Regions:
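Divalent-metal coordination cores built from histidine and acidic residues
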Residues: 2-13, 89-195, 259, 495-499
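Active-site beta-loop-alpha junctions enriched in small/polar residues
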Residues: 78-82, 106-108, 136-141, 171-174, ...
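Histidine/acidic residue-rich metal-binding segments in metalloenzymes
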Residues: 150-169, 175-240, 246-266, 277-291, ...
Length: 578
């Protein structure tokens, strides 16, 4: 059917001249454009809403006493944080009312580059979830680590032409923008009139203005009311984030008023399987916002319409004639729960059950772990004078402290000290078999025996391992390698628990429930080894992220993430940082 014929059929359906495909009967429409809730039937034809008055339909679904709202839109998400493939991600979030996500495939791009982005795009086809992609702007994140790939301007040229790509994802290199680094400016230029998302924690004053003048219109990194207020006053869209590691919704919600609410979007950023399954997705943020006093209609606008308008998705975000029939049916507005989900006019979920047929998934490229030969000696640290820069974990946060501590030394070598909780930490390069092994120390994990390792290690996703002995660390890295990526806890050379993540070392092809159970088993094993952190693997995965203060470890060594430079492990006899 050509476009003109489709328009003519939709017009006929809207005039009730022909039988429509679907009639949703007896509910009330949350009209986010007019800002009201009104009792009304909804007629759907060819995947589009065609009106409110037709009575003849091939299928009628009664929805008495329920609220029909537009399907929810997540304005910024790294799907890879869910540790499942796109089809399995859809299986989990669609029953929670999410029908559209704006994805930044930054994680898989750090492993597979262009092919990683294309894998996400291809995996997103023929699933009952709109997946629009913003191209990663900073791969690799820094030159102080070894990533699996690089996405330079030349790589972005072709990717911008791919169906489903709508802009440039979070521009993390704020100094590069402000001081006009040629590489980042070229990427911004290539984006042209497409949207450019921001990532500007703490940026303020003239630097913020300069950053915005590059065409960057949003930010999801606000953590304080004052920061969000300045960025709002400067014209930015504020993404209200409620992830797993970063939860900022409650802190920022007081800024939302009836006059400015159109500038806010809900985003999950990084949300892990257990949180999605236990709490929810955008529906969780909707309930939380309403519970904290936000008007339900405003909360629904932030859940869908605002994102649709910001991203230029003109036929999403409302229940009105001509819009796509992506609908989340709610049991009320006080603490809304999703009862039915329609995608393009098809019932795809009911009462939490996923109903849509799923096509055979795109075949993933496996074998992403490529290590040089390792031995116990790969983890040896030769002692030097003075205290050592030690990564100090801050429970519940991804920032760390840089602590000058004296490690335990035996026969001229640094060994893990379980009494002081100063453990050896290593980041093993796994993309190019370079043989790089960054060595450091960490305090706060609490292991008294064994080792933990993971191939999920932001942002370059090398293998990060912590342990009470070199043999244990080697055993943990070997176990991750044998699984072609994943999480593992070992003790006495034996694997206690593991979760294989064979897709890029980041994702499982199993259901999210199975992945969540696997993570829980790994965490439980870590707790039995002495670690008392709520999620030690999440903590471990951020110890290699050199763009977050204060001290981090990459495969190339220790990084002072405040001064943004490589530093030696030992301070050379002084307690003052050099």
């Amino acid at each position: 059917m050509g476009q003109m014929e489709e328009y003519e059929e939709l017009i006929a359906a809207a005039r009730c001249e022909i039988e429509v495909d679907l009639l949703l009967l007896g509910g009330s429409v949350a009209n986010l454009i007019s800002g009201e809730v009104r009792r009304s039937d909804v007629a759907v034809h060819k995947g589009r809403i065609v009106g409110f008055e037709c009575s003849s339909a091939r299928q009628i679904i009664p929805l008495e006493d329920q609220i029909l709202a537009p399907g929810f839109i997540d304005g910024h998400v790294h799907i890879e944080s869910s540790m499942v493939t796109v089809p399995e991600y859809a299986r989990a979030v669609v029953p929670q009312g999410t029908t559209t996500v704006i994805a930044d495939p930054h994680e898989i791009a750090n492993v597979w580059g262009e092919e990683g982005v294309r894998y996400i795009l291809q995996s997103s086809r023929n699933v009952p979830l709109n997946v629009f992609v913003m191209l990663p702007s900073c791969v690799p994140a820094t030159d102080m680590e070894t990533a699996g790939a690089a996405l330079g301007p030349d790589a972005l040229v072709g990717l911008f032409e791919e169906e489903g790509v709508i802009g440039l994802a979070e521009v993390m290199n704020c100094p590069g923008v402000i001081f006009r680094d040629p590489q980042i400016m070229k990427k911004i230029q290539l984006a042209g009139g497409r949207l450019k998302d921001g990532h500007a924690p703490g940026l303020s004053g003239p630097d913020l203005s300069a950053y915005i003048c590059a065409g960057i219109r949003s930010d999801h990194e606000c953590t304080t009311l004052a920061e969000a207020e300045e960025k709002l006053f400067s014209g930015m869209f504020i993404m209200l984030r409620e992830g797993s590691a970063a939860r900022n919704l409650s802190d920022l919600l007081p800024l939302v008023t009836l006059k400015n609410s159109g500038q806010f979007l809900f985003v999950s950023d990084d949300r892990h399987p257990a949180d999605i399954l236990r709490e929810g997705h955008i529906d969780f943020m909707l309930r939380k916002a309403i519970n904290e006093g936000l008007d339900p209609i405003v909360a629904l606008q932030i859940s869908s319409l605002n994102a649709a308008r910001y991203f230029g998705l003109a036929d999403l975000g409302a229940i009105a004639p001509g819009y796509r029939a992506d609908i989340a049916v709610l049991d009320g507005l006080d603490a809304p729960r999703v009862t039915h989900v329609f995608k393009d006019g098809r019932l795809v979920a009911r009462d939490g059950d996923f109903l849509a047929p799923m096509n055979r998934p795109v075949k993933a490229m496996h074998k992403s772990i490529h290590l040089a030969a390792l031995s116990r000696r790969s983890f040896e640290i030769v002692a030097e004078k003075g205290p050592a820069r030690t990564i100090g974990i801050v429970p519940g946060q991804i920032i760390t402290r840089s602590l000058p501590l004296f490690p335990l030394i035996r026969e001229g070598k640094v060994v893990s000290d379980t009494d002081q909780d100063i453990l050896k930490l290593a980041v093993v390069e796994r993309h190019r078999a370079t043989g790089n092994v960054g060595l450091g120390l960490v305090q706060g994990l609490g292991l008294v025996r064994g080792a933990l390792a993971t191939s999920v290690a932001h942002d370059s996703h090398n293998i990060v391992v912590v342990g009470t002995g070199d043999e244990e660390m080697l055993a943990a890295v070997s176990a991750v390698t044998e699984m072609d990526g994943g999480l593992v806890a070992v003790a006495d050379g034996e694997v206690l628990a593991s979760l294989p993540l064979p897709v890029a070392g980041l994702l499982s092809e199993s259901h999210m429930q199975e992945v969540a159970e696997g993570i829980a088993e790994c965490i439980d094993a870590a707790h039995k080894l002495g670690c008392d952190l709520e999620d030690p693997f999440m903590t471990l995965s951020f110890l290699s992220l050199p763009v977050i203060p204060e001290l981090k470890l990459t495969d190339r060594g220790l990084v002072d993430a405040v001064a943004f430079r490589m530093v030696p492990l030992f301070l050379g006899g002084s307690l003052e940082d050099d």
